[in-house]
Amino acid sequence: MGGLGSPCGGCKFLRRKCVEGCVFAPYFCYEEGSSNFAAIHKVFGASNFSKLISHLPDHDRCDAVRTISYEAHSRLHDPIYGCVSQIFSLQQQVVSLQAQVVLLREEASRRFPQDDPGCNMKQQEKVLAQQMPQDLHNWFHQGILDSDFDPMSGTTRDNERSMDHNESPCSSNESLNYYQEVNFPWSV
């Protein structure tokens, strides 16, 4: 049940009374939870969602809810491909960057032949870094290094909210405040 007698986000969306032991309450808070639940309900259905969650071990449910919510938002944004379009886009970026690495290595081998004893790898990297195309350099430093997105957990580092352990089986770093934790490639 949500805090202080208020329904959880799932029950709020379904306009029903939130009972103790509600399957949605640990994952959908009153404030932001109804919009996340709305996406899940529209794409998968509340009944299918509750059946899926009830068959999972308790320790896997937070990750499953986070994943299902992300997939639902992706499907609403792109009804045909859903999150597959994002995966494909990232794969294309990887292929492009791998091709650039190959080109830079070839250029380095031309500029610094292996038989030159005075040349070391640090010098090669320094010269190549100075000659790296500015747009690639900016993209890498702004998009990857300066990002607060943690790809291992799928969350942002400064926007994790803490939850009372009596309120939810999710630990504080697994809270489901999706708008702050998940960096959707579109505006939510």
Swiss-Prot record:
<dbReference type="InterPro" id="IPR004883">
    <property type="entry name" value="LOB"/>
</dbReference>
<comment type="similarity">
    <text>Belongs to the LOB domain-containing protein family.</text>
</comment>
<feature type="domain" description="LOB">
    <location>
        <begin position="6"/>
        <end position="108"/>
    </location>
</feature>
<feature type="region of interest" description="Disordered">
    <location>
        <begin position="150"/>
        <end position="172"/>
    </location>
</feature>
<protein>
    <recommendedName>
        <fullName>LOB domain-containing protein 14</fullName>
    </recommendedName>
</protein>
<dbReference type="Pfam" id="PF03195">
    <property type="entry name" value="LOB"/>
</dbReference>
<feature type="compositionally biased region" description="Basic and acidic residues">
    <location>
        <begin position="157"/>
        <end position="167"/>
    </location>
</feature>
